[in-house]
Every structure is written in structure tokens, then in C-alpha cells.
């Protein structure tokens, strides 16, 4: 709320880090919006930027953009191509990890954010720039898929029900 107030004085606002596990509510006049990826100054119709330290779930981002457009807000969004992408296997890992802890659960939301950042740290993640390079994307998915499936089933003892050919990133099938 404070950021939204301050943002009206600047040309751009940046979402610096995190993922869609951290949301914020913006009230501007009669409009109340809930964002988790889009920077809070979006209603000011200024440049909004997402830095490389943000884990992006493309479906969530597309829904937030659609919400703004439905309200007639012009979206001037810049995304660092090095942003890492939340892939369905990150969510599978998150759920399996949480389920394997029994009574010692941490209360994860199951959104896969932590596992996306783990891939970022290990230099194994899929980045936004990979989404426009089909061969690179496919190769990275195949490399990661086997490892993630093995981890879910063997390390966490959970079922891995995802099928690679059925993976959607955003609204596009891979």
C-alpha cells in the first residue's frame, strides 16, 4: 500500500524478488486488486518491471495481466529474461516434500517457489528466455524431468503423476 502511494511519483516500479507466494493488495480509488507477481504500481499505468530474482509462474502472471486489461489498464511490463520459471514439477516436489514430513510439515503453500529457486541456485532452472527457444526448453525439461521424478518417488516416496508431453508452461503446451 505504501509502495503504491510512493509509486505515483516515479516513472517505474520494480518487483525485485520472490514469487507468487507473496501477494499484495492495492486499493486505488474504487479499484481493489490482488497481485502476486505484478508490481504494485500497475494501476498508475507506468513502466513495471520484474527483476531476475523473481520466480515466475506464467499462468499466474498471465492471469494478473488479463485482470488489469479487463479493467482497462494499459500494461507496460518488462521482464528480465533471466527470471526463472515455475514448472509443474516444482509444485510436485513441493507437495511431495511437504507430504513426506508427516507431522513436521512446514506449512508450504505447494506453489513450487522454493524448488524453483533451488534450480536457480544449481543453475539447472528454466528461465524466461528459454521459453522462446524451443530446443533449449525441451532439452532442459528432459534433463530436469528424470531427476525430479526420481526425487519425488525415491527420496520423498510419493507418486509422480506428471507426464512430460502434457506439461503446460503458461498457456502453451511444451
Where are these regions (language model features)?
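Non-transmembrane, aqueous-exposed alpha-helical and coiled segments at domain scale
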Residues: 1-171
Amino acid at each position: 500500500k505504501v509502495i503504491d502511494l510512493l509509486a505515483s511519483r516515479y516513472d517505474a516500479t520494480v518487483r525485485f524478488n520472490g514469487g507468487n507466494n507473496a501477494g499484495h493488495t492495492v486499493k486505488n480509488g474504487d479499484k481493489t486488486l490482488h497481485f502476486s507477481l505484478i508490481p504494485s504500481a500497475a494501476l498508475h499505468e507506468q513502466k513495471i518491471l520484474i527483476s531476475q530474482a523473481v520466480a515466475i509462474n506464467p499462468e499466474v502472471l498471465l492471469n494478473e495481466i488479463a485482470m488489469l486489461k479487463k479493467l482497462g489498464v494499459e500494461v507496460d511490463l518488462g521482464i528480465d529474461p533471466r527470471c526463472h520459471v515455475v514448472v509443474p514439477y516444482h509444485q510436485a516436489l513441493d507437495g511431495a516434500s511437504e507430504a513426506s514430513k508427516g507431522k513436521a510439515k512446514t506449512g508450504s503453500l505447494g506453489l513450487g517457489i522454493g524448488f524453483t529457486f533451488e534450480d536457480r541456485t544449481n543453475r539447472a532452472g528454466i528461465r524466461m528466455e528459454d521459453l522462446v527457444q524451443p530446443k533449449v526448453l525441451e532439452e532442459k525439461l528432459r534433463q530436469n524431468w528424470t531427476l525430479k521424478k526420481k526425487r519425488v518417488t525415491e527420496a520423498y516416496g510419493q507418486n509422480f503423476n506428471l507426464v512430460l508431453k502434457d506439461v503446460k508452461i503458461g498457456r502453451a503446451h511444451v
